[in-house]
Amino acid sequence: MINIRRMWQPLTATPFLATAAHHEILPCESLQGWIRCFWGGIAGAGASPTRIIPDVCADLIYHIDETAGRIIQASFCGVSDVCGTAHLPLIPGHTVSTFAIRFHAFGAYAFADDALRGTLNGFESPEVRFGRLDRALRARLLELDGLTARAAYAQSVLLAFQCRENPLVETAADVLLCHRGTATISEWAHELFISSRQLERLLGEYWGMTPKKGSALVRYQALYQEICRGTLNNVQDAVARYDFADQAHLCREFRRYHGENVSRFFKTSCENGRTMEENGVYPPEEAST
């Protein structure tokens, strides 16, 4: 069922954005069950803050002073369950770039040296849990020029990596995505032939979150994706499809994670007429091979 994980493409707050400051590159097919994308760009003077929404992903981020030839900041940002803004570090008179790997929430553990427990909404040095990967990336990041070259190198490192694979964790992701986050915790555990308590421990260690939180974030993202793609036409359809108790319940959950009224977002999406088919998130040439 790895195809379910490969097909799962969570979206950011600006899914159609592709500029010099922010661009995304898909990984090769072999990594798509674990890696959402490589992303980065050049921060221009007066760059505005970036809006952040829960995308059910974790990021390994490097900010690079291209002028001085040094990494000025590196961090691992765990899965987030809040919306907000992020600011890029800027140095007057210097060119600053960003390079990052965006892991699926259920894929980061495969490249980590330690458990991801406690990383929800976390911000820490890559050395804490990704020491081996961090050292391999730092070895060549500075000598490579541009996002495409850095993404290609990072991809080669990840492909050669001795991953920590756990079939039960991967099956848990398949079940979660198959139900779009709507299954109860007991139903989820039953499909895995384990207890709810075992599921709680499993996800805490490998995903850094509880089953309840994982379900809520996937349900929000699946709903958000459908609105962006234009496959949901109104709030009433969304309530039924995603098993919300009523419209008020859906509105509360959407506002909690998106910071916006869902009815207004439906209207804005329809007025913009922006669908995934018309505005693909990734230019075709930016899919890695």
Indicate residue ranges for each PLM-predicted region:
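Long, low-complexity intrinsically disordered regions
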Residues: 186-189, 200-205, 212-215
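Residue-level "edge-of-site" marker
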Residues: 202, 217, 252, 268
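A secondary-structure capping/hinge motif
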Residues: 205-209, 253-263
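Alpha-helical bundle regulatory/interaction domains
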Residues: 1-173, 177-180, 184-186, 192-196, ...
